[in-house]
C-alpha cells in the first residue's frame, strides 16, 4: 500500500512539472525602429504593451522583465 501511495505522489508531481513547462507560449520582444525593446513599468497586463504588439501584428502582449513581450510574435515581425 505504501508503494502505491509513493508511486501516486511521484506521478502527480511529474504531471504538475509537465503542465507548468508546457504552458510556455511562444513569442518575442518587439523592437522599435532603432532596434530597442519597448520598455514598460507595470508588470503583467499592460495596455501600452498590447498596443505595441498590435502594431507588430499580434493580438496580445504584456510587460515582462520591464520590456514588452508579444505572444506568438514571429521573428520576421519583430522590427517595424
Swiss-Prot record:
Tissue-specificity statement: Expressed by the venom gland.
An annotated Gene Ontology molecular function: toxin activity
Protein name: Toxin Acra I-2
Localization per Swiss-Prot or TrEMBL: Secreted
S-S bonds: 40-63, 49-68, 53-70
Keyword Disulfide bond annotated: yes
InterPro entries, A to Z: LCN-type_CS_alpha_beta_dom, Scorpion_toxin-like_sf, Scorpion_toxinL/defensin
Signal peptide interval: 1-22
Amino acid at each position: 500500500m505504501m508503494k502505491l501511495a509513493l508511486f501516486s505522489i511521484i506521478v502527480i508531481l511529474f504531471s504538475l512539472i509537465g503542465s507548468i513547462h508546457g504552458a510556455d507560449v511562444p513569442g518575442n520582444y518587439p523592437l522599435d525602429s532603432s532596434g530597442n525593446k519597448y520598455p514598460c513599468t507595470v508588470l503583467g497586463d499592460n495596455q501600452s504593451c498590447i498596443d505595441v504588439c498590435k502594431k507588430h501584428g499580434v493580438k496580445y502582449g504584456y510587460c515582462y522583465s520591464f520590456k514588452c513581450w508579444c505572444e506568438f510574435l514571429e521573428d520576421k515581425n519583430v522590427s517595424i
